[in-house]
Amino acid sequence: MKATEQHYSIKEAMLFSQRIAQLSKALWKSIEKDWQRWIKPFDLNINEHHILWIAYHFKGASISEIAKFGVMHVSTAFNFSKKLEEKGLLSFSKKQDDKRNTYIELTEKGEEVLMKLMETYDPTKNAVFNGALPLRELYGKFPEILEMMCIVRNIYGDDFMEIFERAFENIKEDFIEQDGKLVKRKPKTEEHEKELASQAN
């Protein structure tokens, strides 16, 4: 058997790629609308919010990492990072051992904005969430989208998916639900002190 032998027809390939393209376009339109509505009160656009999100999970990222994991051109990552710096949400720096790359980190104000955004997330205003809700009610969990993740891994590589997964693990670890909102978990020492104080009373 030749290595170049196809196990699919051109028609099958075209139908699959066009189905993915059309579904992705439809989903993106809805995602974009909801995302913009969510961040609008904070005077951010989608690229700016995405950069803040990546900077939070990286705890300091290079512009090239922002571009890679934000799926944007390096110049886009740099220009929007500059705008965030002007707003006081990011700071730029160079590392002693790496003068070629520019690194960004969230400022205190930047982290505050990101935390407030997390608190204002309202699932009832998210069309994709609401579209998936009947599946959760039927199967007891949200779709895991494993096949889609596999396709993305094959296009963007393992590094991309590792960061993707790390971001969601961080949310599980760093945030708790309180009064119907997502809030940042207090540092363990602070939680422990509160626990001791309540036991003493």
Curated annotation (Swiss-Prot):
InterPro entries: HTH_MarR-typ, HTH_tscrpt_reg_Hpr, MarR/SlyA-like, Tscrpt_reg_MarR-type_CS, WH-like_DNA-bd_sf, WH_DNA-bd_sf. Residues 63-86 bind DNA. GO terms for biological process: negative regulation of DNA-templated transcription; response to stress; sporulation resulting in formation of a cellular spore. One of its GO terms (molecular function) is DNA binding. Residues 182-201 are annotated as: Disordered. SMART domains: HTH_MARR (SM00347). Coiled coil: none annotated. Residues 13-157 form the HTH marR-type domain. Disulfide bonds: none annotated. Negative regulator of protease production and sporulation. HAMAP family: HTH_type_Hpr. Homodimer. This is HTH-type transcriptional regulator Hpr.
